[in-house]
Amino acid sequence: MKVAISYPPLEPAPGVPLLGQNRQFQWFSSPTYIYPVVPASAATLLQEREHQVLWDDGIASEKSYTSWFQEIVSAAPDVIAMETKTPVVKRHWAIVDQLKKQLPGTKVVLMGDHVTALPEESLDRSAVDFVLTGGDYDFLLQGLCEHLTGQESVLPPGIWYREGSRISNTGSFQLNQDLDDLPTIDRNLTRWQLYSEENGNFRRTPGAYVMAGRDCWHHRCTFCSWTTLFPTWRRRSPERVLDEVGHLIEQYGVREIMDDTGTFPVGDWLHTFCKGMIARGYNQQVTLDCNMRFDALSRDDYELMKRAGFRLLLFGLESANPETLRRVSKGLTVEQIVDSCEAAQAAGLYPHVTIMFGYPWESYEDALHTLNLGRELLVKGHAYTVQATIVIPYPGTPLFQECKANDWLNTTNWSRYDMREPVMKTPMSDAQVKKLVQGIYNVAFNPEFVARRLLSVRGWDDMRYFWRAGRKVMGHLIDFARE
């Protein structure tokens, strides 16, 4: 069976869509391509089962829609699987319908957090054949293809489909597969080079993405779209992840690896992994980045991670207001945020913080507390970089349900959930929300901030990184200046 895993170009577009491997969707002015780990695992698993796999990322390949469409029609796959998200699902419905007109015998599949939350909607609104729910696209797509080829008589749980004129499903998705059973991702099949340079996280290139777990052991943040995909927590063994790190170093010359697990494993798992990095000598060959929670690690943990080769730790700050931290179930205090940043920085690590503006219950004065904390952490060097965004309540999240219950939604036109404007009612104007986002990125022009960055330069990798980072900052300022 010929199977295409496709990311169609989206035209017209206000920028590059951050779709695959993204918990939030944005259009970026500056080209950014992030390796979609689970779809890449799906491609590898299908190829191992002797299917013919076409890795078809028209976005990262920078194809026009016309070229992409002509090529996919010419290839005539038996199955086309596409990952979608809330702001672009209507575009994908139109693409699905065009594909079904040209390739009526091809089965078209949608997967992602939006269709997991609202699976029946896509079957009602488009000619799509199957909707995969939950985040295990690899296991589910394999099960679907084996069913279509007659190898399995029953579809796995979590699949929605048509049965005549009726919409049916196989029940709730299950996340009970052992992640260590998955094969090592075939990076050549999935064209890893497309994603190895244009990424703001990478200080050294080429870079690569991996995932030690699915997805976050906290998994309670009310705004996170991936809690819809992964309501439970699983992780691979430290040895399997170490083997993948070695594979990326030895086979592809990768110099920086981003582990995009929602929150990297801690405790004994982390200690075993770090000691393995040191024992195998990988800490001398590659730099590691990961997502982490404030107050999850001790100073000794940070120091061990530094010795193991970690560089960038991405923390979700989200707000400096205790009431907001409570309402979105962060389980944090402002003091823990500051202490963790200082401890990580003191160990020689580089904290990156994410901040959001536009909560329905926050006034402009409330949001200024967050802006001021973010600016202070950056200027004083306790945080190295920042990402600021507008809060978007994605379907399937507790925040979306809270918005519906309190009449906080300005619209349910999904295309407007693309972070170019607030879609929740707030005490602030849209212009004020965007001004707050820009206010964080304007720290890049602060003299003390600039001086600290210049003093941190250690070589050509740093200079190239700062050049790329400067372009990204200007892009973000443009992104949130648009009307």
Language model regions located:
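Flexible glycine/acidic-rich beta-alpha junction loops that bind and position SAM and/or redox cofactors
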Residues: 12-16, 267-268, 323, 327-328, ...
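Radical SAM [4Fe-4S] cluster-binding motif and immediate context
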Residues: 180-181, 185-352, 357-359, 372
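Conserved acidic residues
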Residues: 78, 129, 255, 311, ...
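Short glycine-rich His-centered loop
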Residues: 3-31
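Glycine-rich beta-alpha loop elements in corrinoid/cobalamin-binding modules
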Residues: 38, 45-46, 51-175, 392, ...
